Design a protein with these regions (language model features):
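Short, polar loop motifs at secondary-structure junctions
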Residues: 1, 42-48, 158-160
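Active-site-proximal specificity loops/subdomain of glycosyltransferases
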Residues: 1-32
């Protein structure tokens, strides 16, 4: 397993569409994990110790996001099963949270957030991937749940643009698509990673023996 918490298997119900909710496994894994814990996307590289960022926080994420209508539409956009209702205590004005890296300390709040997200996914009728449903379940609901419970969400970087000029993280995000189809870009990117590993972690002397770094 890849989780330090000892999670060996995740069962995502068939009623949760993998086309729509491709990252649902993260939320089902988070349900099993005990807090405090950090959840990190597989396309995020953490280069520095983050202890000083999360110390004294209850919830800490990379950054908040703007409510862009094409990514974060209103409630009328969502195709939900009969009987599902959005909590009237959720504010649709809360800035969503980028969860490529997320720290949470409170077990009770974690369960409230995850249960709300899972309930949304399991009651969604949508079958075609459109980004909006997944980021609502994972990123916007986190902000809504925190707002309802009076929880403060801290950020590593106040604005999304701030992540460009820092050296704590490398987040591939959409760049994965370029690397997938462009061999030369993959070679250049791997070389940069290997050089940084050699420079900042000289004890990792076997890095150049890996095929990907040759």
């Amino acid at each position: 397993h890849i989780w330090n918490g000892g999670i060996k298997e995740i069962d995502v119900p068939d009623r949760v569409s993998p086309r729509v909710f491709w990252a649902a496994g993260k939320l089902y894994a988070l349900k099993k994990a005990k807090m405090p814990a950090v959840m990190v996307d597989l396309d995020l590289i953490v280069w520095k110790n983050i202890e000083k960022y999360i110390e004294g926080t209850n919830i800490c994420a990379i950054h908040r996001e703007g409510i862009y209508p094409d990514v974060y539409p209103g409630r009328e956009f969502f195709n939900m099963k009969d009987g599902y209702a959005f909590d009237p205590g959720w504010s649709w004005d809360e800035p969503p949270v980028n969860t490529c890296m997320l720290y949470m300390a409170d077990e009770q709040f974690k369960n409230y957030y995850v249960d709300s997200s899972i309930n949304f996914m399991e009651n969604c009728r949508e079958t075609e991937e459109n980004l909006c449903h997944m980021v609502f379940a994972e990123q916007r609901l986190l902000a809504m749940c925190a707002g309802r419970e009076g929880k403060i969400i801290s950020s590593f970087f106040p604005e999304a643009a701030d992540i460009e000029g820092q050296d704590v993280f490398t987040h591939l995000w959409g760049y994965k698509n370029i690397l997938k189809f462009n061999f030369q870009k993959r070679v250049e990117f791997n070389d940069r990673l290997c050089e940084r590993i050699e420079r900042e972690f000289p004890e990792e002397t076997v890095i150049r023996e890996l095929n990907v770094c040759r």
